[in-house]
């Protein structure tokens, strides 16, 4: 990869370190493109990618073995994963540092958003790095998780393959990490790398300063518990379809109310269960036909 040099626009010196351990490190190349690449370039993000096979021994560098108790597939070995996570937690391995894929114009950024506290369960040391293990058996990943994790200093991803990682690795890792097993949906992927790309993008875009306009994520789907409503741009009429007139009214209160109504109606139609956690006003209830 070609090195990219640019001015550092991160004036508050706040930086998130991501380390990813995988048997397919090349799969993580998208982490250096687009918004994440810009975050690397501007000094908000550092990414290290580590090949799990670097900790494997023997001629074949095997990282998996047959499961105890029988059954299909292979399980990833603890004697490979354990040392890998030990070294990454301690910073004893340099890894493959991702550089921004494309140079950008150096435009100063300003953002007033305050971070949120690190998330730690009772009895956990909040100063330990956060270990995320993508697995369909994990807790569903949410926007609230992304917001909380955007305030972390160091996140490590352990990408499983085959039938997953020996569970003892997860249990042992709690001595050095705050561990979260997390799922990005009710489906099964070939490995954890895709989930890493999803989670990393959701988290990094919420770091103050990464997005140029704070409203870009304040008005996201799920930021207020609702799905985001429709968006429109030029031309005003396209293939016989018109942009709603209210958007040309110049009345910000009317526009905000319309957007709220559209978000409510879309949520009711697509994800009605989300409304249970939303504090609805009298006007909201009228829009939804609940009064």
Curated annotation (Swiss-Prot):
GO terms for molecular function: tRNA (guanine(37)-N1)-methyltransferase activity. Keywords: Cytoplasm, Methyltransferase, S-adenosyl-L-methionine, Transferase, tRNA processing. Its EC number is 2.1.1.228. Coiled coil: none annotated. S-adenosyl-L-methionine binds at residues 160, 184-189. It comes from the Bacteria. Pfam families: tRNA_m1G_MT. GO terms for cellular component: cytosol. Gene3D superfamilies: 3.40.1280.10, tRNA(m1g37)methyltransferase, domain 2. InterPro entries: Alpha/beta_knot_MTases, tRNA_m1G_MeTrfase_C_sf, tRNA_m1G_MeTrfase_TrmD, tRNA_m1G_MTases_N, tRNA_MeTrfase_TRMD/TRM10. One of its GO terms (biological process) is tRNA N1-guanine methylation. Specifically methylates guanosine-37 in various tRNAs. Homodimer. Belongs to the RNA methyltransferase TrmD family. This is tRNA (guanine-N(1)-)-methyltransferase.
